[in-house]
Amino acid sequence: IFVIFAYTECYFMRAEKEIETLTIEEIRDRLSKTVNEQELPILVEGFTVLAKSRNLFDIAMNAQTPYRLPGIRIGLLTGGAVNVTVNLINHDVKAPTLAFFSSGSILQLNKVTAEGEVQGMMIEPNYFAELFPHNVPPMFNGQLKDAFIPVDNRDKEKVEHLFQALTLTMKEPAYNRQAAQAIITALCYIYNQ
């Protein structure tokens, strides 16, 4: 793991690109200047949700700039296509596709189609440990660094509905932590399948 990390650092340094850390707070700050409140990521202690929204990649990230992503991130590309480099590997991704990035992954956005649409979430590692104190789903045990999984429309709709349920739960006047945890757990098991 150390060798891969060192090689990653050297690769991006050779390309004369400084790796920025892109936190959810930074994404929210960048988006808040141009998008309405409904499209901003919802922050709650331990995790953050980005509801289904139009192409926000070009607002949140600068193309051809590598970003280190803190936190475990799962997402769904619901429309369009993207070309990204994740942990030194280039990917052409078309919707509908599930995406997973482990904490510390390095992502560089290369190209996004105009109809690109995404929804997803970031889970802090300590919150993830709270969700799964004994049996972490294998996909999230730390050995897998990133994954793109094409899905059919049925699986896409399942994930979309769970993200929608989580978003609605978080917008309730009285936030229900147990309900949110149950939905996040269900999402993680779907990604693990």
Where are these regions (language model features)?
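An amphipathic alpha-helical interaction segment
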Residues: 157-193
